[in-house]
UniProtKB/Swiss-Prot annotation:
Reaction it catalyzes: orotidine 5'-phosphate + H(+) = UMP + CO2
PROSITE patterns assigned: OMPDECASE
GO molecular function list: orotidine-5'-phosphate decarboxylase activity
Entry protein name: Orotidine 5'-phosphate decarboxylase
Family recorded in the similarity comment: Belongs to the OMP decarboxylase family. Type 2 subfamily.
Length: 278
């Protein structure tokens, strides 16, 4: 299988540079006249799968599935399988992070050969970038991707992410370490896009420099959270093709009509299409 970085680049080139979120928040379920149950969750996801067919990347927010226990995970597995059947890359927004054997277990679940394994997964480096090594290695071996939190769109994140770490912000340190990992892998795999990226929020002031990342940049916070699609170009010194804007509520609030959700997604895609320009 081709590495995630190359698959992502191809998907964006053919289907546009947009990541659509599946965030089945209880308030959205109510707005869609669905019960806040596993059955309501499944119905919500069925609508999203149908509406998002043919787009490049879809990002299920794992926490909203976990809330329903085993039944929620069953819905997540089915949703991921259905998205893949439609040719969509699946990014599991799980934000996992731990050490040693526990991190290895997360790696097996999300980047190995389990029913939950996604094309890519988000992770937290709070326990140190080196703690992510088990998952990074499993993801690389299985041609999957990883997005490491660096500078997030929530205002509370700045307290830690903008702290000084030997002359660099913590966010910049994370970006630089991801860049080094991509360089190491590139020496073995050859000149293809890196499969490990970072998360940099659309509303972050003074974002880290990602010009040397060698991988993709997931950009949440577009739409309802205040990030403007037209203002993303050059974020952190990124090349346009590096950026992958992510949007959820701005699109999902158009539901429950499949056609209306899809139309909202297409409007958002039109607004970020300039990021595909060579």
């Amino acid at each position: 299988m081709t590495g995630f970085g190359a698959r992502l680049a191809e998907a964006k080139a053919h289907r546009g540079p947009l990541c659509l979120g599946i965030d089945p928040h209880p308030e959205l379920l109510r707005a869609w006249d669905l019960p806040a149950t596993a059955d309501g969750l499944a119905a919500f996801c069925d609508i999203c799968v149908a509406a998002f067919a043919g787009f490049a990347v879809v990002k299920p927010q794992v926490a909203f599935f976990e809330a329903y226990g085993a039944a929620g995970f069953a819905v997540l597995e089915g949703t991921m399988a259905a998205l893949r059947a439609n040719g969509v890359l699946v990014l599991a927004d799980a934000k996992r992070g731990d050490i040693g054997s526990t991190m290895a277990a997360y790696a097996a679940a999300w980047a190995g050969d389990s029913p939950l394994a996604a094309d890519a997964v988000t992770v937290s480096p709070f326990l140190g970038f080196g703690s992510l090594r088990p998952l990074l290695e499993v993801a690389t071996a299985n041609d999957r991707g990883v997005f490491v939190l660096a500078a997030t769109s929530n205002p509370e994140g700045a307290t830690i992410q903008r702290a000084d770490a030997d002359g660099r912000t913590v966010a910049q340190l994370i970006v630089d370490q991801v860049g080094l990992f991509n360089s190491e892998v590139g020496e073995v795999t050859g000149p293809e896009p890196g499969s490990v990226g970072v998360v940099v929020g659309a509303t972050v002031l003074n974002p880290p420099d990602v010009s040397g990342l060698g991988g993709p940049v997931l950009v949440p916070g577009v739409g309802v959270q205040g990030g403007r699609p037209e203002a993303l170009g050059g974020l952190g010194g990124a090349a346009p093709q590096q950026l992958l804007p992510a949007v959820s509520r701005e699109v999902l609030r158009a539901g429950p009509s499949i056609s209306e959700v899809r139309a909202a997604a297409e409007r958002m895609l039109d607004s970020v299409a300039y990021l595909s320009a060579v």
